[in-house]
Amino acid sequence: MVKSHIGGWILLLFVATWSDVGLCKKRPKPGGWNTGGGSRYPGQGSPGGNRYPPQGGGGWGQPHGGGWGQPHGGGWGQPHGGGWGQPHGGGGWGQGGGSHGQWGKPNKPKTNMKHVAGAAAAGAVVGGLGGYMLGSAMSRPLIHFGNDYEDRYYRENMYRYPDQVYYRPVDQYSNQNNFVRDCVNITVKQHTVTTTTKGENFTETDMKIMERVVEQMCVTQYQKESEAYYQRGASAILFSPPPVILLISLLILLIVG
């Protein structure tokens, strides 16, 4: 009788734990940053020592005059010049103000900003960047560059450097170095293009410092994504059919015995 109760409680605990792990897999993992050594990537022969020379035009996947996923010059889901359900120009239904003021035109749905922010925090795929994801915002790392001038320059200009990195899933790379190299290249290039479009330019010192900063952030992103990837793999192995069937069989034998 005692064995029966013990077996029942063990089975109940196992089922509850299994369900909780399944739910936890859907929760986003927290981010962070760490500090480390210098850049491991030599220059690529760009003029002036910069690997990423300023380029004209807009950034990859970036709309004209707005942020990521933002319409041209306007807010999310906001009509031009009027509120929802109102025709353009302030006229009444069926009156002037263009074809949008006629009956039969459905209202445009509003975008839920909480969903947009949640997707970005979890590493949303960026359109136009070929499968790259945008990581969560990080605090810029505290780095010493070996001389007072660059240390002071970084402290005074750190706001000019990115606080998010672009990356692909870790399972597409054979090691950390390849992940970090690709992450640094696309992040620095995208940030340089976007900033140059706004009329700002980067000096050789800016490029050197930015590469070091982005490198540390990419290392942090790799560690975060690797931990999440291995946790998903471990959960898949633990709760794969053979171990589950074996455990349930042992519990049944314990209860029957």
Curated annotation (Swiss-Prot):
Cu(2+) 1 binds at residues 64-66. Residues 33-48, 55-101 have a biased composition (Gly residues). Disulfide bonds join 183-218. It is a lipid-anchor; GPI-anchor. Cu(2+) 3 binds at residues 80-82. One of its GO terms (molecular function) is copper ion binding. Cu(2+) 4 binds at residues 88, 90-91. Residues 25-234 are annotated as: Interaction with GRB2, ERI3 and SYN1. Residues 54-95 are annotated as: 5 X 8 AA tandem repeats of P-H-G-G-G-W-G-Q. Monomer and homodimer. Has a tendency to aggregate into amyloid fibrils containing a cross-beta spine, formed by a steric zipper of superposed beta-strands. Soluble oligomers may represent an intermediate stage on the path to fibril formation. Copper binding may promote oligomerization. Interacts with GRB2, APP, ERI3/PRNPIP and SYN1. Mislocalized cytosolically exposed PrP interacts with MGRN1; this interaction alters MGRN1 subcellular location and causes lysosomal enlargement. Interacts with KIAA1191. Its primary physiological function is unclear. Has cytoprotective activity against internal or environmental stresses. May play a role in neuronal development and synaptic plasticity. May be required for neuronal myelin sheath maintenance. May play a role in iron uptake and iron homeostasis. Soluble oligomers are toxic to cultured neuroblastoma cells and induce apoptosis (in vitro). Association with GPC1 (via its heparan sulfate chains) targets PRNP to lipid rafts. Also provides Cu(2+) or Zn(2+) for the ascorbate-mediated GPC1 deaminase degradation of its heparan sulfate side chains. It is linked to PrP is found in high quantity in the brain of humans and animals infected with the degenerative neurological diseases kuru, Creutzfeldt-Jakob disease (CJD), Gerstmann-Straussler syndrome (GSS), scrapie, bovine spongiform encephalopathy (BSE), transmissible mink encephalopathy (TME), etc. The normal, monomeric form has a mainly alpha-helical structure. The disease-associated, protease-resistant form forms amyloid fibrils containing a cross-beta spine, formed by a steric zipper of superposed beta-strands. Disease mutations may favor intermolecular contacts via short beta strands, and may thereby trigger oligomerization. Contains an N-terminal region composed of octamer repeats. At low copper concentrations, the sidechains of His residues from three or four repeats contribute to the binding of a single copper ion. Alternatively, a copper ion can be bound by interaction with the sidechain and backbone amide nitrogen of a single His residue. The observed copper binding stoichiometry suggests that two repeat regions cooperate to stabilize the binding of a single copper ion. At higher copper concentrations, each octamer can bind one copper ion by interactions with the His sidechain and Gly backbone atoms. This is Major prion protein. The lineage of its organism: Eukaryota, Metazoa, Chordata, Craniata, Vertebrata.
